[in-house]
Amino acid sequence: MALKIACGQIEIIAGRPDLNTKKILHHMDMACQNGIDILLLPELAVPGYFLGDLWEQTAFIEDCAAYGDEIIAATENCGELCVIFGNIAVDNSKRNEDGRARKYNAAFAAQHGKLLTNGTLPYDFIVKNALPNYREFDDNRHFYGLRQLALELDKQVAGLHQPLTVTAHGETVKLGLMLCEDGWTENYFLDVPQLLAQHGAELLCNISCSPFSINKNSKRHRLFGSAAQKAGIPLIYCNNVGIQNNGKNIFTFDGCSCVYGSDGWLLTDAPMYAEATLCAGWDSKAKAIDTSGITSDPRSEIDEVYHSLRYGCQRFLEQAGIGKMTIGLSGGIDSAVTAALFVDILGPDNVLLVNMPSRYNSPMTQTIAEQT
């Protein structure tokens, strides 16, 4: 009998572990009802990712840990279901390099009300190895990475990347579990997917909280498809959707979760900017994965960018409770495109366009604004 694996591409609301946990528990209930054996959920699915100084608030961290415990406890009533989800992990007996309580960006695997472990760490969770510290990412400021932990334990970091064994209904699979950046091998000297495969992993699983950028999905396919082919085993990539604010910019998370075969070919993928569940079957005898899904047609770059802008603006307006918009229309291209975007989102009756003539704008731009 094949193990049924589901990838839950859910919307994560940064800073609302209560709402995120409620959604996770709902997906667990649905997984139980549909006979799912392993449910994958995104990185930092409980707290969200771009939180800034909220990561330094003890009460918030304690809330996230408590909600994580609620998810773990809920698996006791879910039969054989194993739930893998991302959350912050705290070791109050240790210090981060900033002197605060140590925090890890971690993956938890829960089954029968208990946590599963690969036996290589002093913790019952998987620690993220590669902490991005560029552009919008500031992980080194908040989290302690596996490389730092390996140095502290006087161990080789390569040896700490071991598969996690999951058994359900008498069937077993060894999962090579990674957190987001751990799979972006071209950026780092340590090839985590290959290490996991060398140490016996049969199926690679990457849980991510990865924001959209231009052509990023094409890069994902190239990178993760290559990793699966090189390792010679299938790979499941689980990302979230939603918007998150790092204090400077609002980022959209496009989802695009997918499954790759051992030959690196894309087997099935989830749509952009929509909650979805991908399902796959794992044949423990053949060591192969099977999906009944289809792959979506690739979008053009312009289509991807517009979809991202529209989704991000719409979700921001919804979260802020804004249903109407006033836009100053100059007669230039910027305000015209902005007007078109918000009319598409809110409808023409909910967008007021205002042109304010002065001695500094010409009759031509005033006419163009009126025509817009």
Language-model features and meaning:
Residues 332:
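ATP/NTP phosphate-donor binding region
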Residues 1-328, 339-355, 360, 364:
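Enzyme catalytic cores with a strong preference for nitrogen-chemistry domains
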Residues 363-372:
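Glycine-rich phosphate-binding loop and adjoining beta1-alpha1-beta2 segment
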Residues 335:
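Catalytic nucleophile loop
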